[in-house]
Swiss-Prot record:
The gene is gshB. It comes from Brucella melitensis biotype 1 (strain ATCC 23456 / CCUG 17765 / NCTC 10094 / 16M). Mg(2+) binds at E280, N282. Pathway: Sulfur metabolism; glutathione biosynthesis; glutathione from L-cysteine and L-glutamate: step 2/2. The keyword Metal-binding applies. InterPro entries: ATP-grasp, ATP_grasp_subdomain_1, Glut_synth_pro, GSHS_ATP-bd, GSHS_N, PreATP-grasp_dom_sf. Residues 125-309 form the ATP-grasp domain. It is an enzyme of class 6 (ligase). Its cofactor is Mg(2+); Mn(2+). Keywords: ATP-binding, Glutathione biosynthesis, Ligase, Magnesium, Manganese, Metal-binding, Nucleotide-binding. This is Glutathione synthetase. The lineage of its organism: Bacteria, Pseudomonadati, Pseudomonadota, Alphaproteobacteria, Hyphomicrobiales.
Length: 312
Protein backbone atom coordinates (compact mmCIF):
# COMPACT_ATOMS: atom_id res chain seq x y z
CA UNK A 1 0.00 0.00 0.00
CA UNK A 2 1.35 3.42 -0.95
CA UNK A 3 1.85 5.68 2.06
CA UNK A 4 1.80 9.45 2.42
CA UNK A 5 5.17 10.24 4.04
CA UNK A 6 6.10 13.69 5.37
CA UNK A 7 9.77 14.27 6.15
CA UNK A 8 10.50 16.86 8.85
CA UNK A 9 14.11 17.76 8.12
CA UNK A 10 16.63 20.51 7.54
CA UNK A 11 15.89 21.92 4.09
CA UNK A 12 16.58 19.37 1.34
CA UNK A 13 18.74 21.95 -0.46
CA UNK A 14 21.34 21.75 2.34
CA UNK A 15 21.74 17.97 2.19
CA UNK A 16 25.00 16.30 1.16
CA UNK A 17 23.51 13.29 -0.60
CA UNK A 18 26.74 11.29 -0.48
CA UNK A 19 26.34 10.55 3.22
CA UNK A 20 22.86 11.69 4.23
CA UNK A 21 20.64 9.07 5.85
CA UNK A 22 17.43 11.09 5.47
CA UNK A 23 18.05 11.29 1.73
CA UNK A 24 18.64 7.52 1.58
CA UNK A 25 15.37 6.86 3.44
CA UNK A 26 13.55 9.20 1.04
CA UNK A 27 15.01 7.45 -2.01
CA UNK A 28 13.86 4.06 -0.75
CA UNK A 29 10.39 5.37 0.11
CA UNK A 30 10.01 6.79 -3.40
CA UNK A 31 11.24 3.52 -4.91
CA UNK A 32 8.43 1.72 -3.06
CA UNK A 33 5.81 4.06 -4.46
CA UNK A 34 5.24 6.14 -1.34
CA UNK A 35 4.25 9.79 -1.79
CA UNK A 36 6.84 12.13 -0.26
CA UNK A 37 6.28 15.54 1.33
CA UNK A 38 8.96 17.87 2.68
CA UNK A 39 8.88 20.49 5.42
CA UNK A 40 11.28 22.06 7.91
CA UNK A 41 10.58 22.39 11.66
CA UNK A 42 9.89 26.12 11.18
CA UNK A 43 6.87 25.24 9.05
CA UNK A 44 5.23 23.15 11.77
CA UNK A 45 2.20 24.70 13.55
CA UNK A 46 -0.66 23.89 15.89
CA UNK A 47 -3.91 25.85 15.86
CA UNK A 48 -6.93 24.96 18.00
CA UNK A 49 -5.44 21.52 18.60
CA UNK A 50 -4.81 20.79 14.90
CA UNK A 51 -1.17 20.03 14.04
CA UNK A 52 -0.25 21.09 10.52
CA UNK A 53 2.74 21.95 8.38
CA UNK A 54 3.39 23.89 5.20
CA UNK A 55 4.48 20.94 3.08
CA UNK A 56 5.87 20.61 -0.43
CA UNK A 57 5.52 17.49 -2.50
CA UNK A 58 9.03 16.10 -2.99
CA UNK A 59 10.78 13.99 -5.59
CA UNK A 60 14.37 12.88 -5.03
CA UNK A 61 17.16 11.75 -7.35
CA UNK A 62 20.58 10.34 -6.54
CA UNK A 63 22.24 13.03 -8.67
CA UNK A 64 24.63 15.44 -6.99
CA UNK A 65 23.62 19.04 -7.67
CA UNK A 66 20.19 17.98 -8.96
CA UNK A 67 18.89 15.78 -6.17
CA UNK A 68 15.36 17.08 -5.59
CA UNK A 69 12.25 18.74 -6.98
CA UNK A 70 9.71 20.43 -4.72
CA UNK A 71 6.11 21.29 -5.48
CA UNK A 72 4.17 24.34 -4.35
CA UNK A 73 3.87 24.73 -0.56
CA UNK A 74 0.45 23.88 0.87
CA UNK A 75 -0.56 23.81 4.54
CA UNK A 76 -1.80 20.32 5.43
CA UNK A 77 -3.26 18.74 8.54
CA UNK A 78 -0.57 16.19 9.43
CA UNK A 79 -3.16 13.59 10.43
CA UNK A 80 -3.67 13.25 6.66
CA UNK A 81 -0.20 11.68 6.52
CA UNK A 82 0.45 8.01 7.21
CA UNK A 83 4.04 8.48 8.37
CA UNK A 84 6.20 11.40 9.52
CA UNK A 85 9.96 11.04 9.68
CA UNK A 86 11.39 13.15 12.53
CA UNK A 87 14.77 13.79 10.92
CA UNK A 88 16.02 17.32 11.53
CA UNK A 89 19.56 17.42 12.87
CA UNK A 90 20.24 18.47 16.47
CA UNK A 91 21.03 20.62 18.48
CA UNK A 92 18.60 19.05 20.90
CA UNK A 93 17.29 22.40 22.14
CA UNK A 94 13.88 23.80 23.07
CA UNK A 95 13.05 24.31 19.39
CA UNK A 96 13.66 20.60 18.79
CA UNK A 97 11.79 19.60 21.94
CA UNK A 98 8.78 21.74 20.98
CA UNK A 99 8.41 19.83 17.70
CA UNK A 100 8.19 16.58 19.69
CA UNK A 101 5.40 18.04 21.85
CA UNK A 102 3.41 18.94 18.73
CA UNK A 103 4.02 15.67 16.90
CA UNK A 104 3.07 13.50 19.87
CA UNK A 105 -0.45 14.95 19.53
CA UNK A 106 -0.91 12.99 16.29
CA UNK A 107 1.18 9.87 17.03
CA UNK A 108 0.46 6.95 16.62
CA UNK A 109 -2.60 7.67 14.40
CA UNK A 110 0.02 9.19 12.15
CA UNK A 111 3.14 7.11 12.77
CA UNK A 112 6.01 9.41 13.78
CA UNK A 113 9.45 7.82 13.49
CA UNK A 114 11.09 7.81 15.94
CA UNK A 115 8.35 8.11 18.59
CA UNK A 116 8.47 11.82 19.56
CA UNK A 117 7.72 11.25 23.24
CA UNK A 118 10.63 8.87 23.65
CA UNK A 119 12.93 10.99 21.48
CA UNK A 120 12.29 13.87 23.87
CA UNK A 121 12.79 11.69 26.93
CA UNK A 122 15.96 9.95 25.67
CA UNK A 123 18.74 12.49 24.98
CA UNK A 124 21.59 10.41 23.59
CA UNK A 125 24.20 11.33 26.17
CA UNK A 126 21.74 10.74 29.05
CA UNK A 127 19.84 7.70 27.73
CA UNK A 128 23.11 5.78 27.49
CA UNK A 129 23.67 6.20 31.25
CA UNK A 130 20.91 3.66 31.85
CA UNK A 131 23.62 1.10 31.02
CA UNK A 132 26.51 2.23 33.26
CA UNK A 133 28.35 -1.09 33.06
CA UNK A 134 28.58 -0.71 29.26
CA UNK A 135 30.05 2.80 29.43
CA UNK A 136 33.36 4.41 30.34
CA UNK A 137 33.34 6.34 33.62
CA UNK A 138 31.14 9.38 33.01
CA UNK A 139 30.27 12.54 34.94
CA UNK A 140 27.36 14.89 34.13
CA UNK A 141 27.66 18.14 36.06
CA UNK A 142 28.06 21.90 35.95
CA UNK A 143 30.17 21.95 39.10
CA UNK A 144 33.79 22.78 38.16
CA UNK A 145 35.11 21.15 41.33
CA UNK A 146 33.47 17.85 40.38
CA UNK A 147 35.19 17.96 36.99
CA UNK A 148 38.55 18.76 38.55
CA UNK A 149 38.19 15.84 40.98
CA UNK A 150 37.23 13.59 38.08
CA UNK A 151 40.30 14.77 36.16
CA UNK A 152 42.58 13.99 39.11
CA UNK A 153 41.12 10.49 39.26
CA UNK A 154 41.48 9.58 35.59
CA UNK A 155 44.11 11.91 34.10
CA UNK A 156 43.11 11.90 30.42
CA UNK A 157 39.48 12.99 30.01
CA UNK A 158 37.04 14.14 27.36
CA UNK A 159 34.96 17.26 28.01
CA UNK A 160 31.90 17.87 25.83
CA UNK A 161 28.49 19.61 25.79
CA UNK A 162 25.54 17.54 26.98
CA UNK A 163 23.39 18.39 23.95
CA UNK A 164 26.01 18.89 21.25
CA UNK A 165 26.28 16.92 18.03
CA UNK A 166 28.68 16.16 15.21
CA UNK A 167 31.76 16.46 17.42
CA UNK A 168 31.22 20.19 18.07
CA UNK A 169 32.73 21.37 21.35
CA UNK A 170 34.46 18.08 22.17
CA UNK A 171 37.86 18.46 23.88
CA UNK A 172 40.50 15.91 24.86
CA UNK A 173 42.42 17.02 27.94
CA UNK A 174 45.56 14.94 28.31
CA UNK A 175 47.08 14.35 31.72
CA UNK A 176 49.01 17.51 32.59
CA UNK A 177 47.12 19.76 30.16
CA UNK A 178 46.65 23.17 31.81
CA UNK A 179 43.57 24.31 29.89
CA UNK A 180 40.88 22.70 32.06
CA UNK A 181 40.08 25.80 34.13
CA UNK A 182 39.75 27.98 31.02
CA UNK A 183 37.58 25.38 29.30
CA UNK A 184 35.29 25.12 32.32
CA UNK A 185 34.90 28.90 32.32
CA UNK A 186 34.09 28.86 28.60
CA UNK A 187 31.59 26.00 28.95
CA UNK A 188 29.92 27.82 31.84
CA UNK A 189 29.50 30.92 29.66
CA UNK A 190 28.35 29.09 26.52
CA UNK A 191 25.99 26.48 27.96
CA UNK A 192 23.17 26.82 30.47
CA UNK A 193 23.02 23.04 30.82
CA UNK A 194 25.44 20.70 32.59
CA UNK A 195 28.22 19.17 30.52
CA UNK A 196 29.97 15.81 30.36
CA UNK A 197 33.37 14.65 31.49
CA UNK A 198 34.32 11.14 30.44
CA UNK A 199 37.38 8.96 30.89
CA UNK A 200 39.41 9.16 27.69
CA UNK A 201 39.49 5.88 25.77
CA UNK A 202 42.79 5.39 23.96
CA UNK A 203 41.08 2.87 21.67
CA UNK A 204 39.50 5.84 19.86
CA UNK A 205 42.71 6.15 17.83
CA UNK A 206 41.70 2.86 16.18
CA UNK A 207 38.21 4.21 15.56
CA UNK A 208 34.79 5.02 16.96
CA UNK A 209 32.29 2.49 15.63
CA UNK A 210 28.77 3.50 14.58
CA UNK A 211 26.34 0.57 14.79
CA UNK A 212 22.86 0.88 13.26
CA UNK A 213 19.93 -0.97 14.83
CA UNK A 214 16.50 -1.48 13.29
CA UNK A 215 13.77 -2.47 15.76
CA UNK A 216 16.45 -3.17 18.34
CA UNK A 217 18.51 -5.50 16.12
CA UNK A 218 21.96 -4.63 14.73
CA UNK A 219 21.96 -4.48 10.93
CA UNK A 220 25.26 -2.82 10.04
CA UNK A 221 28.31 -0.94 11.26
CA UNK A 222 31.12 1.29 10.12
CA UNK A 223 34.29 2.43 11.84
CA UNK A 224 35.19 6.14 11.94
CA UNK A 225 38.90 6.82 12.36
CA UNK A 226 40.05 10.24 13.59
CA UNK A 227 42.68 12.18 11.71
CA UNK A 228 46.20 12.38 13.14
CA UNK A 229 45.56 15.95 14.31
CA UNK A 230 42.10 15.51 15.89
CA UNK A 231 40.72 13.67 18.91
CA UNK A 232 37.28 13.42 17.27
CA UNK A 233 36.22 10.72 14.84
CA UNK A 234 32.91 12.22 13.65
CA UNK A 235 32.68 12.25 9.86
CA UNK A 236 31.44 15.87 10.06
CA UNK A 237 34.89 16.90 11.28
CA UNK A 238 37.06 14.72 9.06
CA UNK A 239 36.79 11.24 10.57
CA UNK A 240 37.54 8.59 7.92
CA UNK A 241 34.85 5.91 7.48
CA UNK A 242 35.97 2.33 6.94
CA UNK A 243 34.22 -1.01 6.63
CA UNK A 244 33.68 -2.90 9.86
CA UNK A 245 32.07 -6.04 11.28
CA UNK A 246 30.53 -6.46 14.71
CA UNK A 247 32.68 -8.00 17.43
CA UNK A 248 31.26 -10.39 20.05
CA UNK A 249 31.39 -7.56 22.62
CA UNK A 250 29.44 -5.25 20.31
CA UNK A 251 26.81 -7.94 19.76
CA UNK A 252 26.58 -8.29 23.54
CA UNK A 253 26.00 -4.53 23.87
CA UNK A 254 23.28 -4.62 21.19
CA UNK A 255 21.57 -7.58 22.89
CA UNK A 256 21.54 -5.68 26.17
CA UNK A 257 20.04 -2.46 24.84
CA UNK A 258 17.76 -3.97 22.16
CA UNK A 259 14.77 -4.65 24.45
CA UNK A 260 14.81 -1.05 25.76
CA UNK A 261 14.87 0.31 22.20
CA UNK A 262 11.90 -1.86 21.19
CA UNK A 263 9.98 -0.94 24.34
CA UNK A 264 10.32 2.75 23.47
CA UNK A 265 9.29 2.25 19.86
CA UNK A 266 12.65 3.24 18.38
CA UNK A 267 12.79 1.93 14.81
CA UNK A 268 16.09 3.54 13.73
CA UNK A 269 18.93 3.96 16.23
CA UNK A 270 22.67 4.51 15.97
CA UNK A 271 25.01 3.67 18.84
CA UNK A 272 28.66 4.66 19.19
CA UNK A 273 31.19 2.17 20.55
CA UNK A 274 34.88 2.74 21.33
CA UNK A 275 36.75 -0.44 22.15
CA UNK A 276 34.55 -2.31 24.63
CA UNK A 277 32.48 0.71 25.67
CA UNK A 278 29.29 2.33 24.39
CA UNK A 279 29.43 6.14 24.52
CA UNK A 280 26.12 7.30 22.95
CA UNK A 281 22.70 6.07 21.85
CA UNK A 282 21.53 8.31 19.00
CA UNK A 283 17.74 8.31 18.52
CA UNK A 284 17.26 11.77 17.00
CA UNK A 285 18.80 11.67 13.53
CA UNK A 286 21.26 8.75 13.32
CA UNK A 287 23.38 8.62 10.21
CA UNK A 288 25.82 6.24 8.50
CA UNK A 289 23.59 4.02 6.38
CA UNK A 290 24.84 5.27 3.00
CA UNK A 291 28.45 4.53 3.94
CA UNK A 292 27.52 1.06 5.19
CA UNK A 293 25.71 0.28 1.94
CA UNK A 294 28.73 1.40 -0.09
CA UNK A 295 31.02 -0.83 1.97
CA UNK A 296 29.04 -4.08 2.12
CA UNK A 297 25.84 -3.65 0.09
CA UNK A 298 23.45 -3.77 3.07
CA UNK A 299 20.37 -1.71 2.20
CA UNK A 300 19.44 -0.48 5.67
CA UNK A 301 16.89 1.94 4.20
CA UNK A 302 14.96 -1.08 2.88
CA UNK A 303 15.07 -2.74 6.32
CA UNK A 304 13.82 0.51 7.84
CA UNK A 305 10.84 0.72 5.50
CA UNK A 306 10.03 -2.95 6.05
CA UNK A 307 9.72 -2.13 9.76
CA UNK A 308 7.64 1.00 9.14
CA UNK A 309 5.29 -0.70 6.68
CA UNK A 310 4.71 -3.54 9.16
CA UNK A 311 3.22 -0.95 11.52
CA UNK A 312 0.77 0.51 8.99
Amino acid sequence: MALKVAVQMDHISTVNITGDTTFALSLEAQKRGHELFHYTPDWLSMRDGVVSARVEKMEVRDVKGDHYTLGEPVRRDLTEMDVILLRQDPPFDMNYITTTHLLERIHPKTLVVNDPTWVRNSPEKIFVTEFPDLMPETLITKDPQEVMDFRREFGDIILKPLYGNGGAGVFHLADGDRNLTSLLEMFGQLFREPFIAQRYLKDVRAGDKRIILIDGEPVGALNRVPSETDARSNMHVGGRPEQSKLTPREREICARIGPSLKERGFILVGIDVIGDYMTEINVTSPTGIREIERFDGTNIAALFWDAVEARR
